A protein has these predicted regions:
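Conserved glycine-rich Rossmann-like NAD(P)H-binding loop of the short-chain dehydrogenase/reductase
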Residues: 35-51
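Hydrophobic structural elements of the Rossmann-like NAD(P)H-binding subdomain
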Residues: 13, 92, 146, 189-192, ...
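Canonical Rossmann dinucleotide-binding motif of NAD(H)/NADP(H)-dependent dehydrogenases/reductases
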Residues: 3-40
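Short, small/polar-rich loop/turn modules that mediate ligand/substrate recognition or access, typified
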Residues: 142, 183-188, 244-246
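Conserved mid-core segment of classical short-chain dehydrogenase/reductases
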Residues: 56-57, 63-74, 78-118, 135, ...
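Catalytic loop of short-chain dehydrogenase/reductase
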Residues: 15-25, 96-183, 193-199, 216, ...
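Short C-terminal tail/terminal secondary-structure segment
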Residues: 245-270
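C-terminal helical subdomain
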Residues: 124, 191, 209-244, 249-253
Length: 270
């Protein structure tokens, strides 16, 4: 169902890999709501995914870019404005990876070069996106930038490893840059802290299936799915949320405010 919430708006969507990706769902919903946008991912990620299929489905163009490269980002924003015919109204940052998680390194024994890579790709890339956008005046007033995060930024989930540190930095960048970008250009910057979601990236975390089951039982409304997250992103890109900025917005069925549930307690008696 379309309400034309994004009619006439132009955007850039980072991080769609395949139809399991939240970014993929956001692109589909943004298209349904009347937006035009470009799609981007790192060249190495594009070889692993099916971005061409999404581009065809949403009538979008793909611009490969390494989000850790300022030069790539300058080219991305420049080309996107040329393709879309004007400044950008919304950006989705859905980027995250950890070599330490992939290689199953213990948090107390991290490979520090991999650690720096995790922080650069998963968090500092947002700072670079915002820096390039602000310096080139690429985003319209009242534009919206949304980055996806996870509650492990604030609480311990052992197997989430150094990605938890990256998400903490991501949320801090959102607040800090959100202040400056709001003051100078009235651009809003927020993070959405999503329920554990079955994606290619999430599935790489040890014990992920068990944790999804736990989270489902710990959330009064149950886990929020990827489509529901996409719908929340659409609302954040729309004019209905013009005065929301510098926030970490939980989209998790109530998990973040729940100490314990009867469903979880009952399992201790089994």
């Amino acid at each position: 169902m379309s309400n034309n919430l994004l009619k006439g708006k132009k955007g850039i969507i980072f991080g769609a890999l395949n139809d399991m990706s939240i970014a993929w769902k956001v692109a589909e919903r943004a298209h349904e709501e009347g937006a035009t946008f470009t799609l981007t991912n790192a060249p190495i990620a594009m070889r692993m995914g099916a971005l061409n299929e999404l581009a065809e489905k949403t009538n979008s163009q793909i611009i490969p870019a390494d989000a850790t490269s300022v030069e790539d980002l300058k080219n991305l924003f420049s080309q996107s404005q040329e393709i879309l015919g004007g400044k950008i109204d919304f950006v989705l940052h859905s980027i995250g990876m950890s070599p330490n998680v992939r290689k199953k390194k213990d948090y107390t024994d991290l490979n520090y070069e991999w650690y720096k890579k995790t922080l650069d790709v998963s968090a500092m890339s947002l700072h670079k996106v915002l820096k390039v956008a602000s310096e080139t005046d690429a985003i319209n007033e009242w534009g919206s930038v949304v980055a996806l995060t996870y509650i492990a930024a604030q609480r311990i989930f052992p197997d989430y490893n150094d990605m938890a540190d990256a998400k903490s930095l991501l949320e801090s960048i959102t607040r800090s840059f959100g202040y400056h970008y709001g003051t100078s250009n009235k651009v809003r910057v927020n993070t959405i802290s999503q329920s554990p979601t079955v994606t290619t990236a999430g599935s790489g975390v040890s014990g992920f299936d068990k944790f999804i089951d736990f989270s489902e039982n710990m959330s009064p409304l149950g886990n929020a799915g990827s489509l529901d997250c996409a719908n929340y992103c659409i609302s954040m890109f729309s004019d209905l949320t013009k005065y929301v900025t510098m926030q970490n917005l939980f989209h998790d069925g109530g998990f973040s405010s729940t100490g314990v549930t009867n469903a979880v307690m009952d399992r201790f008696g089994e």
